[in-house]
């Protein structure tokens, strides 16, 4: 009997309400699923192994059913109708680029960092975007990694903070569905471009589930042009990324969606660049070893190259006579500083730079220059769909109406940066907001959001059967 119990234990270890679940918690098992290293220290290796062997994606909402999803469809159809009265554009006719800039953070926002004033500002152009685009801080669910999770959030509008467990949706969620809804489905043509290997995070398989028309990567049937590496770095530069972005823009006459993923500033940061003017000019309390200062100087030089490449790219799209909107975002902090410092600077070390820029032609045809600062200083990656649709003055579907209401009415929703279960709410000043302070309307929005996310991560995808909900 004992042997049978031990055999069956992993199968129900994390399932609420069962006998094994209660035995598990009788051992004072403190599950967080956010920080595996800390979990081992708190729970020991055996309990931690059992915690992770049978992950629950989300708790099932009490009233989850086809009728519950249909109710939300009807509810947000009405919201979409109201929103669309003030919108005139069809996003399908736009060219929209979601540009994941690998590990991009404004170097001046690192905690305690000091860059010698004699050194040039490495990100002067990107900082200048504050005055002519929607611009602010993006809250990342990762530190030094988690690229695919940020990409999943941008494409789906769903949120890592809603998960019960630490997981990678591209690997552990998306493959469970034959089709997976993304912003790309709202366009007649969608593609992804990545001047690196395409197999990481099951991207090739998942983009098929997204019904992307094309994925250009190193070794694919679609050639990556103008491959250029900087200094001793083994990664293709951001110039390569944007040259291929321009190529894709010019290949289509009408609107399209492009998921543009860079690689230049990926770790490690091993003094790649000759004539690096930031070497010896970086200091700060957290930059207390020669090795860390050298890595930071290398990273800063990389951001300078990014800044120049972005400036060139925006100059190019401004000359193109079709509406183009660029959503630029850093996916996470680089792994220069020890992750242990995130406990001291939880929000700061999970905040990257983002901006949303609509080219001259788009602005001449109804797109906004920038959105109100109040709701955009701190955002989550999952907010980008709603923000892009607002900036391009595009009509929304019922699902996008839900995302729009969440962005407008709620603080930014993100993972709990302290490593605890559940999501965290961050206001426009970068400060946590307690759930109990939310209004009834705000709490209802979160409940609706959780229901839809459960449906497309652990549920039966009833929303796909509701005509027009996603598209």
Where are these regions (language model features)?
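Solvent-exposed soluble domains appended to multi-pass membrane proteins
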Residues: 78-87, 100-101, 106-471
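N-terminal secretory/membrane-targeting segments
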Residues: 1-93, 117-136, 169-177, 304, ...
